[in-house]
Amino acid sequence: MAQYPVAQVVGGQQGGVVGVVSQPSDVNLDIGGRVERMQNELDVPEQIVRDLLSVAGADIVVVADDSGSMACVANPGNYSNPMTRWDELRETLIKLAHMLLVVDHTDGFNVQFLNDPAWHELHTKQQVEALFTNRRPSGTTPLGARLQPLLNGSWHPKGHGAETDLILLVMTDGSPSDVDFAGLTRLVQAKAKNVYVTFLMCTEDDDVVGAYNRYLDRIPGVDITDDYASEKREVEAHGRKLSYYKWLAKAVLGGKLVKYDKMDEAPQSCCTVA
């Protein structure tokens, strides 16, 4: 499988990646103090911070939907602040960059759009904003072609054959255009053992979300995460709270740690995140 080019985005220009600035307040803190600082900044429980720290050695890769339907309004009922699915995708990536900086995941994450073969290595909010400058959603949803090299290990941020865990976040609002769900299921079932996948739904369309759940959610190492508004309703229906960063942490961790996959279900055991 051919290797795709890597584009590193810095302040609106391509070039070297800006280094991550460590927080001076952490210099004299022990691990407990650092975890507490991270908890306070993200407003998430200690358990989630420690789980995020536990995957610090993993590579995080995002496949982002830039098809034409992403220009649709995400929540038509929100008259005061209407946002498109594309706007919400951008905000999610900005918050992902921030969350990873807070938990000292200094590698950042790599992004590829469905209709653009270039890879983009991102570390900061400014880099995400630069990536979206003058970029508009258009085209189809070729999930099969984009996911195959990631699932089978022929493309990895550290090079072909790398053995570090790969956390793959697939952000999409529709059905694949180049393969049916049965074909997509076969691709995902054949994934390498070190690849963990979360599909983040950028839509509240019950038919689309239902198809991903029926075909893919039971595959080991795979999680389906609803959009934040829908997931928040589900979690709170079971008596829990769901902040934005808790939802985002669930997306990052859900493919690898089963307790996050079960977070929107009724409590059944001590192994479910509250």
Q: Predicted regions span which residues?
A:
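Intrinsically disordered cytoplasmic terminal tails of membrane proteins
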Residues: M1-L29, R233-V235, Y245, A251-A274
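Acidic, polar low-complexity linker/tail segments
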Residues: G16-Y79
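Surface-exposed acidic, glycine-flexible loop patches that form ligand/cofactor-binding
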Residues: R50-S54, M99-V103, L151-E163, R186-Q189
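Structural motif
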Residues: D59-V61, T164-L169
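Von Willebrand factor
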Residues: W119-D165, P176-V179, C202-G210
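Von Willebrand factor A/integrin I-like adhesion domains
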Residues: Q126-F132, D205-G255
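VWA/integrin I-like adhesion module and closely mimicked acidic/polar interface patches used
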Residues: S138, G174-I219, D223-T225
